[in-house]
Curated annotation (Swiss-Prot):
It comes from Symbiobacterium thermophilum (strain DSM 24528 / JCM 14929 / IAM 14863 / T). GO terms for biological process: amino acid biosynthetic process; aromatic amino acid family biosynthetic process; chorismate biosynthetic process. Its EC number is 4.2.3.4. One of its GO terms (molecular function) is 3-dehydroquinate synthase activity. The gene is aroB. This is 3-dehydroquinate synthase. The lineage of its organism: Bacteria, Bacillati, Bacillota, Clostridia, Eubacteriales.
């Protein structure tokens, strides 16, 4: 990842967990202490292997396990981790190592961004969604009762280590949810990659390691290109929010009972409907192509049964892409190309949301 004078490596491959300590020492040679943050689901699977790899490299490592789930992305949990940093005697050469999915990465990243005004962060994503999206780009944060990621900071990791072997332990539902972000990358930037995903759906869901490695590597490439051009989301990087306007609103409206990727899938379909109704989409019925692909990946493409689209409206008004009271929508023009625009009529939005009604 190249960010002007800043740069950091993204490692993608099988068997990287055993090399974690050596990789940290290579890129953070001054680091002698670390706080390893993981959750209750990941700790029994990889917690000891990660800690041992760090210790073998001469890095004294304290391990902290937080409850699994979105509720851990809170200021109270961050406060608890600050106390763990103090007990572990971390200094500005020490590292926070985030071992887990997006929740752990966002939470631990926020702590690394703010403890001692910023210490090194190592992302070790263990879910597909985290490997292809949330571990890259430096966004960290916690939630408030009023919505997701309302408190946060930009803090780039010192390195990302994505061991695709960890995907073997993922429940099928989480693997599918991660594929929503993969599809997003194809729609916003690379139609050839989108076609590859369409062809490889069966192999993805079967957990084919070679296919998953390519899916992760290509997604990382696409996201890295976008983030490198716009690290702090002043322009181009906003395209990575395709599907997230409605997706984040849906997550909050239903109390986070669906996975993030499931809500993003619905959000992408909504954006495609709105783009067609607004005359922005240049290719006919992209929403049908998207719907077919997402459904083959076992992802939802409509709202939960019985949900009124109007229930999304209060949460849409809190979208982070609002400027001067107007949402800037990420709209698909054609596969591989999107545009960010505030020029979307209320009628088109209503029509697009109604199209999601089950």
């Amino acid at each position: 990842m190249e960010l002007g004078e800043e740069r950091y490596p993204i490692y993608v491959g099988a068997g990287l967990m055993a090399q974690l300590g050596a990789l940290v020492r290579r890129h953070l040679p001054e680091t002698r202490r670390a706080l390893l943050v993981t959750d209750a689901n990941v700790a029994p699977l990889y917690g000891e292997a990660a800690r041992a790899a760090l210790e073998q490299a001469g890095i004294t490592t304290a391990r902290v396990t937080v409850p699994a789930g979105e509720a851990s992305k809170s200021l109270s949990q961050a406060y608890s981790l600050y106390s763990s940093c103090v007990r572990a005697e971390l200094d500005r050469t020490s590292a926070v190592v985030a071992l887990g999915g997006g929740v752990v990465g966002d939470l631990a990243g926020f702590v690394a961004a703010t403890y001692l005004r910023g210490i090194p962060l190592v992302q070790v994503p263990t879910t597909l969604l985290a490997q292809v999206d949330s571990s890259i780009g430096g966004k960290t944060g916690v939630d408030l009762p009023q919505g997701k990621n309302l408190v946060g900071a930009f803090h780039q990791p010192s390195l990302v280590v994505a061991d695709v072997e960890t995907l073997k332990s993922l429940p099928r539902r989480e693997l599918s949810a991660g594929m929503a972000e993969v599809v997003k990358h194809g729609v916003i930037r690379d139609e050839e990659f989108l076609k590859y995903v369409e062809v490889q759906v069966g192999n993805v869901l079967a957990g084919d390691p070679a296919v998953l490695e390519r899916v992760v590597a290509e997604s990382c490439r696409i996201k890295a290109e976008v983030v490198a051009a716009d690290p702090r989301e002043k322009g181009l990087r906003a395209i990575l929010n395709f599907g997230h306007t409605v997706g984040h609103a849906l997550e909050a409206a239903i109390g986070f009972r669906w996975l993030h990727g499931e809500c993003v899938a619905v959000g992408m379909v909504a954006a495609a409907h709105i783009a067609r109704h607004s005359g922005i989409a240049q290719e006919g019925r992209l929403e049908l192509r998207l719907t077919r692909l997402l459904e083959r990946l076992d992802l939802p493409t409509t709202l939960p049964e019985g949900m009124d689209p109007k229930d999304l409206e209060p949460f849409l008004r809190r979208d982070k892409k609002i400027k001067s009271g107007v949402i800037h929508w990420v709209m698909p023009v054609r596969p591989g190309e999107v545009v960010v625009t505030p020029d979307v009529s209320p009628d088109a939005i209503r029509w697009g949301l109604e199209a999601l009604r089950r």
